[in-house]
Amino acid sequence: MKEELSIDIIGLAGAYSYALDCIEAELVNIKNKHGKRVAYISICMAEYWKIQGDELQDLAMCALLHDNALTQYISEELKKDSVINCKKDLSKKKTNLHCIYGEKNITKIPFKTDVSNVILYHHEHADGTGPFQKKWNEIPLFARIIHLADTIDIIGNNTGSGNNSWNFICQYLLKNMDGLFDSECVNAFFHAFTHSESFICLRDNSFEMKLWEIIPRQKQVFDWKTCKNVADFFAKIVDYKSSFTSRHSIGVAEKAAFFAQYIGYDSINVQKIYLAGALHDIGKMAVGNEILEKPDKLTDDEFSKMKNHAGYTYLILSEVNDFEEIRDWAAFHHEKLNGKGYPFGKTAAELNEPERIMACIDIYQALTEDRPYKKGLSHEKTCEILDDMAQKGFVDSDISKKIRECFGGI
């Protein structure tokens, strides 16, 4: 496929940083917008070195996604731990593992400059006492900047607001200069934030407008391979959230794209539907695992919270510029033709073909995939269920029939 798709990639990274914040809030009580605050502190510090253009945008991208492997780390290393044990492990052990995973994941993002080892070393200490025992002169500048920004935001989160918080941060930086942080980065921070008033925007959330003023939201043009890599990167973050759906987003993306090709969609729309499939469950990042992985039937209140995930998908993807079409394809996957779906209760007249496809493919993937608590159903049995849903007015009967044809020989 040679046709290319334009995407607001920095906006998509910003949207996903919110989803990552939901995980960190669940585990270590960090307030929302942590990723964006780290990005803002980082780009303000960057002025000290006169970093501009593509380098500045790539620094912001790395900062927004610095904890991109958090769900993967928890899933692979702490599978059976309680939240309390997760907190303990996240703060004291194996910090390097999420850095290793994150560094590998980030290679799928099309950066314009070299960001090698930025995510890998973003928890290193200037004096060599960090996870990889690298000293400040062995650590990429962007990693050093993000490490300080990340630490300062966590400290600020735990010390409240106002002059007391600012004074504590100043004392902490000076105390740990040449230990946790190199003097150059400490100087860069004080160059950017000269007094408590200059730091206050991080507490009243006015910083976000300033962040997007400094970092332009320019769309990038991606070929199919790059688009798929970007989609897979974000889908992986979502799928690692729960062991119950470990390949669900990727599976939906692959089947939706395959089906779209089968019924004659052009390459641009195949790419769009792949991306929508990869992103459709991003809202589940805002739903606790005690609900996502509950072995018993959900209570009415729990089911209501579970249903919120589709609304969160809509809300999160609304942050991305010129993304309304893909957002809707992704977020409406639980809508039903008879108006009994969610989050908006759309009716048949309000649901276009790609949105109907996503609803059917999501059901097909969920029923056919293996999960810890069940074996996946056969193609035939799944199609019988889809046909029954079509007869009852839930899903599109033509799409249900074509799914039977499309996947029957696989």
Predicted features and spans:
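Histidine- and acidic-residue-rich, metal-dependent catalytic cores
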Residues: K2-I410
